[in-house]
């Protein structure tokens, strides 16, 4: 299968809430089929009847428009310690939370859920023995989630490499090392990385660790979903692919596609993960600039727009 283009719903959180409003906007205005749904739209911590009702409503909107939820990801308000939390009861809460999230995404037709592998506190990260203990604990937590996710019908889990050590995967080498360890853990379903070409430790002595094209060459065989945004030298944010940012940005479609192909990309999902501050005039530019970003990539990667019915 060829590459497909998708959209992470981070920038739509709080700007949309009702399933029909969200999905109609994606289909009608953004013209993209595949969506990585962030948890804020159907939060696993909400009461069961609310989750079931909103999942039904979301499913109906998907069927009506042709939009597809391909995966579920924690959103802007879900970047938390999770399985790196030092308290066992808090970790237990998040095991159950992610099991519910797996059920929601499976019911919507998605194939995977994920977040960061774990986020450690300063105290725990700076103690090598404690750090190793929590890595083992986090893998055990993910193993329990994986068994549940398999029963729910998901195909894999994913973890997002970040840009600092205590959030894991901050360099290409550390990213590959953790992935090797997760593969060796032999979970009930695989746990792959979900790399972001704009992440990486800016203090690394290896320039590849902050080079979007080096990441694109390194990860496709291990990262079914790859986050992209317009990358600036200052790593200053999740910039959209608009004319203004493209004039100064590092990411060009032809060059990125070449790097991905060199890395073995075949049927990867290339996911736009963008953001705008809650400031005017940016706040009201979100839909138009998302649409511009989708249109920028659509000639190069299948957006699925032909399958939409709205």
Tell me the role of every PLM-derived stretch.
Residues 1-110, 187-194, 287-310:
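N-terminal pre-domain/capping segments
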Residues 3-4, 139, 148-244, 304:
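Acidic/histidine-rich catalytic cores of soluble enzymes
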Residues 64, 81-192:
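Active-site acidic/histidine proton-transfer and metal-coordination neighborhood
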Residues 32-33, 68, 111, 155, ...:
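Short acidic/polar active-site loop segments enriched in Thr and Asp
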